[in-house]
Amino acid sequence: MSAACWEEPWGLPGGFAKRVLVTGGAGFIASHMIVSLVEDYPNYMIINLDKLDYCASLKNLETISNKQNYKFIQGDICDSHFVKLLFETEKIDIVLHFAAQTHVDLSFVRAFEFTYVNVYGTHVLVSAAHEARVEKFIYVSTDEVYGGSLDKEFDESSPKQPTNPYASSKAAAECFVQSYWEQYKFPVVITRSSNVYGPHQYPEKVIPKFISLLQHNRKCCIHGSGLQTRNFLYATDVVEAFLTVLKKGKPGEIYNIGTNFEMSVVQLAKELIQLIKETNSESEMENWVDYVNDRPTNDMRYPMKSEKIHGLGWRPKVPWKEGIKKTIEWYRENFHNWKNVEKALEPFPV
């Protein structure tokens, strides 16, 4: 697919220029992607395929749910008959595959489910997409496939050394996707992004969990020492990265989507306490922190190079202070967008 077809403001008269399938579109990052596509590309039909798991919410899409170029289909990527029929009936041109089980803590107690959804489901989807001869297949992976590192920065050629069931399932799914390029020259592109934060994220992940705990006058639960660091990227920045890959990404390639902004979990908790509880006192901040048992494995860092996507013209734009303030405000008003969301605030999955 050329960049030109994404630059044209209008499609063919009486129809849509392209039909784009986004999997997991009621989830966190994919919902931001769908809103952007629906609003900015009115000549593209955006089809949201989601089975509506516990971490999904159609409220993430309320602003565009009645748009003429948006369609929601409830279904499971692991249902091969359904997926094949979907490609046949919807005449899909482009796939952005976000749908996955993503919570690392949960992957330790539901490893087989992660393998089934993330690996088998991806294989079902890429196979159906190949059979339907779609123009481009974007597989959304994670920096965690590299494993942790204290000093060495990972680039796209670094070996995959995942250390938890979630990362292992994403790495395995990458292998299936990449094999369709190697064997058939099917136009796949793989992305690996840093930790993304912002509105719409189910509060099992560290930033929305800490925000929600503090807003409910509960302590931040820190796994282990809390000295592990993560690179945080705002949701709208990662959407721009995916758009860049759609426009300019080369088939068969992998693109890291990272940021130099890095923060330890302890420092994250302190910053959120300062912003939400309005205190700079170290002793008062300690009163809002609860250290709990660590994960079975918990990588210290995921340092990652992103020069390759920089070469396509993308760089993150949203400063941390701006992004985190927007995120805090959103959770103040939208915490109950999910059913039984309170269970997400426990230190470990329940």
Swiss-Prot record:
Cofactor(s) the record lists = NAD(+)
Enzyme Commission identifier(s): 4.2.1.46
Per its UniProt record, what InterPro entries does this chain match? dTDP_Gluc_deHydtase, NAD(P)-bd_dom, NAD(P)-bd_dom_sf
Question: Which keywords annotate this record?
Answer: Disease variant, Lyase, NAD
Tell me one GO biological process term.
nucleotide-sugar metabolic process
According to its UniProt record, which reaction does this protein catalyse? dTDP-alpha-D-glucose = dTDP-4-dehydro-6-deoxy-alpha-D-glucose + H2O
Q: Which GO terms describe its molecular function?
A: dTDP-glucose 4,6-dehydratase activity
Cite a single Pfam family from the UniProt record: GDP_Man_Dehyd
Residues reported to bind substrate? 142
**What is the top EC class of this enzyme, as a single word?**
lyase
Which Gene3D superfamilies does this chain map to?
Answer: NAD(P)-binding Rossmann-like Domain (3.40.50.720), UDP-galactose 4-epimerase, domain 1 (3.90.25.10)
In the UniProt entry, which residues are flagged as the active site? 143-144, 166
What disease association does UniProt give?
Catel-Manzke syndrome: A syndrome characterized by Pierre Robin sequence and a unique form of bilateral hyperphalangy causing a clinodactyly of the index finger. Pierre Robin sequence includes an opening in the roof of the mouth (a cleft palate), a large tongue (macroglossia), and a small lower jaw (micrognathia).
> Family, per the entry?
Belongs to the NAD(P)-dependent epimerase/dehydratase family. dTDP-glucose dehydratase subfamily.
Q: What is this protein called?
A: dTDP-D-glucose 4,6-dehydratase
